Regions:
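Alpha-helical transmembrane bundles and membrane-interface segments of multipass inner-membrane proteins
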Residues: 1-184
Length: 184
């Protein structure tokens, strides 16, 4: 049972292709259902890992990667299909690339990067998930109207920028306060 959160996370990774394929095929209701299943699995694996202390190094890596792959895939595809604006897609992808590269550089130069996701990062992930679910719901049933989605896109954009800024500031502080490790 200890590895159940990792299995759920792998299940979420496996759902990315069917969500993307059904979205591309215009099967918006099915795509939304699969996407909601993926989003619920994100909450479930985190809950189980914390509640039963089933955390692992693999899970600490796999969970955020699954989130990033799911969200980046769907943002890019949704923009390509004309369902979301490119500007929010560019912001979401740029934020995730910046965080990924920042973490990689920190690890290579300074060693392991310890810490927990910031509250603003969790809010951002929730906003992105809700925004994309709203976009798919709108594509499936014609509601909510475009103006509501545009307003939520702005709210989501603000969380992307605030979260990106928070990570940039955090990485910068850690870089200045951590001595570089000698190269081997």
């Amino acid at each position: 049972m200890r590895h159940l959160p990792n299995l759920i996370c792998l299940f979420r990774l496996a759902l990315i292709w069917p969500v993307a394929a059904t979205l591309a095929a215009g099967q918006y209701a099915l795509s939304l259902g699969l996407f909601v299943l993926a989003a619920v699995s994100d909450g479930l694996d985190g809950y189980l890992a914390k509640r039963f202390n089933w955390t692992s190094e693999l899970g600490k890596f796999l969970d955020p990667m699954a989130d990033k792959f799911l969200l980046m895939t769907l943002f890019v595809e949704s923009a390509w299909l004309g369902l979301v604006p490119w500007w929010i897609t560019a912001a979401a992808v740029a934020r995730d690339v910046m965080i990924g590269l920042g973490a990689l550089v920190f690890r290579l130069w300074f060693g392991p990067l310890h810490g927990r996701p910031a509250v603003i990062s969790k809010i951002n992930t929730a906003a992105q998930l809700l925004y994309l679910a709203g976009v798919m719901f709108s594509a499936a049933v014609g509601f909510p109207p475009r103006e509501v989605l545009d307003a939520f896109a702005l709210v989501t954009f603000v969380t992307i920028v605030l979260s990106g800024y928070h990570y940039l500031a955090t990485f910068t502080r850690r870089v200045w306060s951590t001595p570089a490790q000698p190269s081997s």
